[in-house]
Structure formats: C-alpha cells, structure tokens
C-alpha cells in the first residue's frame, strides 16, 4: 500500500469519503513523504518512544510516526475524519485517535492513560495555523512531561519563535517560547506540498524543553507582564510602554527611570532591543515595587 502522503493516495481518500476541507479548521493535508520523514527524524522517535499528534487529518504524519514509535496518540477535533482514520491507520495497532479539542482536553489525564511512566514522548504535529500559539502555550504552561516538540507551522510564526533581539520578528512570543525551550528552525516547507494549497509557506520548528527556564525570575507571572507591557506599542520607548501598560505597578515615571538606570538599561531603549536576560533582571528589580 502506498504511503498516505502522496498526491494520488490523498486524492483517492478525499474522493472516496466525499471529504470537504474546512477552512475554519485550517485543514491542509501534506502530500510529500520526504517532508514527513524530516519531521519524524528531527523528533528522534525510537522504538520505545511515544508521540502526541494534534490534527492528524487523514493520517499522513500519523502513519510515519506509527512505523517508528511504540505508541501514537492523535487528537482530532473533526468527527468527519474518524472513519477515514479508522481505515488509513488500520494496519497500525499502536495508534489511539481521540476525538477532542486538545485545547479543552485534560492532557495530563490522557498522557497518564496512554503512556508509560518515564516514557520518552514528543509532540509531533502539523499544527493548524489558527491555533498554533495557544496549543504550544497550553502544553508548556501545563508542564506536560514531554521532551519537546517538532511542529510544522506558518513560517511567519516560526520566524517569531526563533527571533533574536533587535529584529522585527522579535517580540513577547519569542521570549515566552525561548524561556521554556531551545528553538531550532529545521527547514522551510513550500506551500506547494499541501492540498489544498495554503496562502503562505510553512516551517518545521523543533523546540526542546529546557530542564529549567533559561533565566531565573522572582515572579514568573509578573515577568511575562513586564515583557508584554514592553512590547505593547513597538515604536514607544521602554519607559513609555511600562508606565502606560504595566498593571499592578505604580504610575511613577521617576521610580521607573531610577530602576531602569540602576539595572543598566537606558529608559529610552525599545522593548525589542532587550535580551531575555535583561528582561529577567528588569522584572526582578520592578517586582520589589509592585503594588500588592
């Protein structure tokens, strides 16, 4: 049997079931086995590994994962795909498809039911563009015990995850993801290898979870509030953004100026020029003056 991720097999499956693509669910099926193999290779899935997939579609990536992993768990929100997955994944007894929205699912419960304690597990997925960021944050903030993520996403989002200070792509998303993970751009994927063809190119991004966050902060929630406030209006200075947008902090420019100067940060700088280490230093200094 041909792999699912070929133009002809994908076309046959879609036509057999009269499947119509839902734009609202970001459904674009990959039809290039080489790209799928690059994804699975970079996930370093072995015979004892587990994999969590989100949005399996008709099972193209799921199939490649099932060939290598001990166990694959796939979350699929679209009920119309369940009978298709039953057929396409029938040769693989190590796959469980869960008909749930991963954003609403109790992922810890699923994890403990489906995987062995201490098992090496990776999240490997071609993520729907419209919910890429919420999915990553849910799994990171809930501290799911996975080794990391190898995910396909809109190239523009991938560029933001990997961005360095001083670039136009660098922002609060870059800092939040890099706080938890080491980010690597594996490859750019052209729009031409999808059916239907999306309007933008994609990127495969590998995120390996850090044993502990890259910087030490006194108050994690406040740290991210400082970061978000600093990027609220990109053209404004750090001083203006923090004085106007940092909730729970005195509206006192003199105090802000003093703290920024004390930690060696020019109040006239813009948020996009600060490294994650500088944000940690700033947050740890500001938190001492936070309103209770």
Curated annotation (Swiss-Prot):
Pfam families tied to this protein: RrnaAD
Key words, A-Z: Cytoplasm, Methyltransferase, RNA-binding, rRNA processing, S-adenosyl-L-methionine, Transferase
Catalysed reactions, semicolon-separated: adenosine(1518)/adenosine(1519) in 16S rRNA + 4 S-adenosyl-L-methionine = N(6)-dimethyladenosine(1518)/N(6)-dimethyladenosine(1519) in 16S rRNA + 4 S-adenosyl-L-homocysteine + 4 H(+)
Stored SMART domains: rADc
Function field: Specifically dimethylates two adjacent adenosines (A1518 and A1519) in the loop of a conserved hairpin near the 3'-end of 16S rRNA in the 30S particle. May play a critical role in biogenesis of 30S subunits.
Positions with a binding annotation for S-adenosyl-L-methionine: 28, 30, 55, 76, 101, 126
InterPro entries documented for this protein: KsgA/Erm, rRNA_Ade_diMease-like_C, rRNA_Ade_Mease_Trfase_CS, rRNA_Ade_methylase_Trfase_N, rRNA_adenine_dimethylase, SAM-dependent_MTases_sf
Protein's gene: rsmA
GO CC terms: cytosol
Domain of life: Bacteria
Name assigned to this protein: Ribosomal RNA small subunit methyltransferase A
E.C. number: 2.1.1.182
Organism for this UniProt entry: Bacillus thuringiensis (strain Al Hakam)
Family recorded in the similarity comment: Belongs to the class I-like SAM-binding methyltransferase superfamily. rRNA adenine N(6)-methyltransferase family. RsmA subfamily.
Keyword Transferase: yes
Molecular function terms, GO-annotated: 16S rRNA (adenine(1518)-N(6)/adenine(1519)-N(6))-dimethyltransferase activity; RNA binding
